[in-house]
Amino acid sequence: MMKKILVVFLCLCMTVITFAACGERGGGGGDEGSAAGGEASYELVSGHVYTEDSLEHQQMLFLKDAIEEKTDGAVKVTIYANEQLGDEQTIAESVVAGSCDVGFSEGSVWATVVNKPEVAVFGLPFQLSGPDAAQEVTKELIKPEMNKLLEGTDIYCLGNVYSGFRHMLSVNKPIKTLEDLKGLKFRVPNATIYVQMFEDMGANPTTTAFSETYQALQQGVVEACECDLANIVQQNWHEVNHYMSKTYHLCANNVICINRAKWDSFPEDIQNAILEAVEESEDYCFEIRATADDEYIGAIEDAGVEIYEVPAEELARMKEACQPIYDEFEGYGLTDLLKKIDDISAKYQ
């Protein structure tokens, strides 16, 4: 609790210093903050939990450069990686509160902090068929549909950080069937959708901070975990697991959100420049992930991990076990949106 309070206090201090500096430069609003100004009149503070060598951080660096270039330096972007501003939920809460400007997390995390479970709709189990489907959903649906769901909240959706498809890893035995998950102490992020999904499949989900997962696996606190290929390698989780099951159980769409009051403080030309930069960063993200996944599979194999391709019929059984989650989201009035997502996914099967 004291750590979370300290994080929020530090974020508030940065925000106060930023606004003071902006005031000295005459960047309080109006056209003085426009892209034509050539001077940093605004600052965006962004935080995330990933390491500085992660693909997520590479996208953020691309986005930082694109925003600063497209605004002629009127907007300065500062990025705090590797949980410097707290864990994923703390950063999301800070964006809602306005003590951090920008963060990205899966919809399930945003759903928790704004208390709107329907916001997790782009992160349901076994929802998308592959990267091409994920890219089309990113381009066509995520930003507009998320902002419909976020009306009345303190955050605004800018776009998406595609973190790839997630797979399961285990220490003591391979996960080959739905029954292999029964009672397994499974590390999951602190997000309702993950807990529900693994409970529905019979596991014993345990929420553990991203940075503490390696130690939890090493010490036997948990027996299994799941993540995308890049972060499995970058977090060295392949060193403490003996098996990986390619389940593609979730497409990790880390939705980029900005504090709404901060967003509304920008003139239209700045907003347009930021949105254009986000779209370019999304394209960049899909490009670098397309070439990286084979390398990560190789690194996992080289560590001696036994990799198992779960058959389609077994994946169908796992998805069927998660049907209560889909029933819940249809109950939020999202049947039409779920069909749009399904139609896109079916195009690439």
Task: Place the predicted regions along the sequence by residue.
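Positively charged n-region of N-terminal signal peptides that target proteins for export
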Residues: M1-V8
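Repetitive helical segments and hydrophobic/amphipathic motifs
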Residues: L12-C13
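C-terminal motif of bacterial Sec signal peptides marking the signal peptidase cleavage site
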Residues: T18-A21
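N-terminal secretory/targeting leader peptides
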Residues: G23-D132, E151-Q349
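A gly/proline- and charged-residue-enriched helix-loop-helix capping module
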Residues: S129-N147
